[in-house]
UniProtKB/Swiss-Prot annotation:
The keyword Ion transport does not apply. This is RNA-binding protein lark. Residues 214-224, 262-277 have a biased composition (Pro residues). Residues 279-288 have a biased composition (Polar residues). One of its GO terms (cellular component) is cytoplasm. A zinc finger (CCHC-type) spans 168-185. SUPFAM superfamilies: RNA-binding domain, RBD (SSF54928). Residues 7-77, 86-156 form the RRM domain. Gene3D superfamilies: 3.30.70.330, Zinc finger, CCHC-type (4.10.60.10). The modification Phosphoserine is found at residues 198, 201, 315, 325. One of its GO terms (molecular function) is RNA binding. Changing residue 170 to Y: Defects in sensory bristle formation and wing shape, and oogenesis. CDD domains: RRM1_2_CoAA_like (cd12343).
Length: 352
């Protein structure tokens, strides 16, 4: 088991057929190998001292083993606190420049904890104990492989790769508090885009379950069509229409005479029935009272019977039928035409 004073190295980009014995034999050239383990396409090597490990990194990083260029660097313990370092950006590199060359340039100014090359630029993590300002001042503009280097302190933040952080965090931006489908990056938060939907809004959780947007409400109908539709549902009473207009008595009674098929108004809406008027032989004797319904006709009292059972018109009156005088017929005709006139005092109905 490796002791606490060993220097642990990480070896990446290994061939799956690479054995631990091959890796141990490769690193024993630079010092004592305390332990060597291979896990699929990467492994770990524990060197006896830090200096032996630095020598192995400088010589074996980028070395071709089983047709694969291996990556050798100091392993970072997740339990132990990281060594404070300064991240330096190195730009304007050529395709021929390798990480060992860049590492060798910075080793003069302190311990190089990590050195990575990404296409035409790279990053160097230099121990804070070293002289970072001198390294930037002297190496900025130095020509390497025919191109001047650009060296400065890196301003980028170390961010986890999408999907590799906390499972409760958004895999697009690495932040918590929202789902990946509501990430501000999708809606252009910096460019004045539309706002992401709220999870508490109507249909928010339903959209998350089914993955589709809710159907929008239908547009309202045009004003003229809406008025036409609403007119069909308005409840008008015949008697309300009869009394709401400002027509005169003649027109109202004319309309009433044309619509005799309708039933009489409710009792609560009827006006009190006036006393029966007196009868007269002339047309002026007819009195039409306001509110009197013309559907019911007044009848005159039966004439006095003669001793021989004959009516005043000379025809016999059969039993079971009642006589109607011409005065009652005239009154019905005048009432339907709307004629008005006061009734002079005269004789009233005879008691039945």
């Amino acid at each position: 088991m490796p002791g606490a004073g060993t220097f642990k190295l990480f070896i990446g980009n290994l061939d799956e057929k690479t054995q631990a014995t091959e890796l141990r034999a490769l690193f024993e050239k630079y010092g004592t190998v305390v332990e060597c383990d291979v896990v699929k396409n990467y492994g770990f090597v524990h060197m006896e001292t830090e200096q032996q490990g630095r020598d192995a990194i400088q010589n074996l990083n980028g070395y071709t083993l089983n047709e694969f260029a291996i990556k050798v660097e100091a392993a970072k313990s997740r339990r132990a606190p990281n060594t404070p370092t300064t991240k330096i950006f190195v730009g304007n590199l050529t395709d021929k420049t390798r990480a060992p060359e860049v590492r060798e340039l910075f080793q003069k100014y302190g311990t190089v904890v990590e050195c990575d090359i990404v296409r035409n630029y790279g990053f160097v993590h230099l121990d804070c104990v070293g002289d970072v300002q001198d390294a930037i001042k002297e190496l900025n503009g130095r020509v390497v492989d025919g191109q001047p280097l650009k060296v400065q302190v890196s301003t980028s933040r170390v961010r986890p790769k999408p999907g590799m952080g906390d499972p409760e965090q958004c895999y697009r931006c690495g932040r918590s508090g929202h789902w990946s489908k509501e990430c501000p990056r999708l809606y252009g938060s910096a460019g004045g885009g539309r706002e992401p939907p709220s999870p508490l809004s109507a249909g928010g959780y339903r959209d998350r379950m089914y993955g589709r947007d809710p159907y929008p409400p239908p547009p309202p109908p045009p004003p003229f069509l809406r008025d036409r539709i609403m007119d069909g549902f308005r409840d008008y009473d015949y008697y309300d229409r009869r009394f709401e207009d400002s027509r005169d008595l003649y027109e109202r009674r004319y309309q009433t005479s044309r619509m005799r098929d309708f039933p009489p108004p409710p009792i609560s809406r009827r006006e009190p029935m006036p006393l029966p008027p007196t009868l007269s032989g002339s047309l002026r004797s007819c009195s039409v009272s306001r509110g009197y319904d013309t559907m019911f006709s007044r009848r005159s009292p039966p004439p006095p019977r003669s001793s021989n059972g004959m009516s005043r018109y000379g025809s016999p009156t059969p039993h079971g039928y009642e006589d109607f005088s011409r005065d009652a017929f005239d009154e019905r005709m005048i009432s339907s035409r709307g004629m008005r006139g006061p009734s002079p005092p005269g004789r009233r109905y005879a008691p039945y």
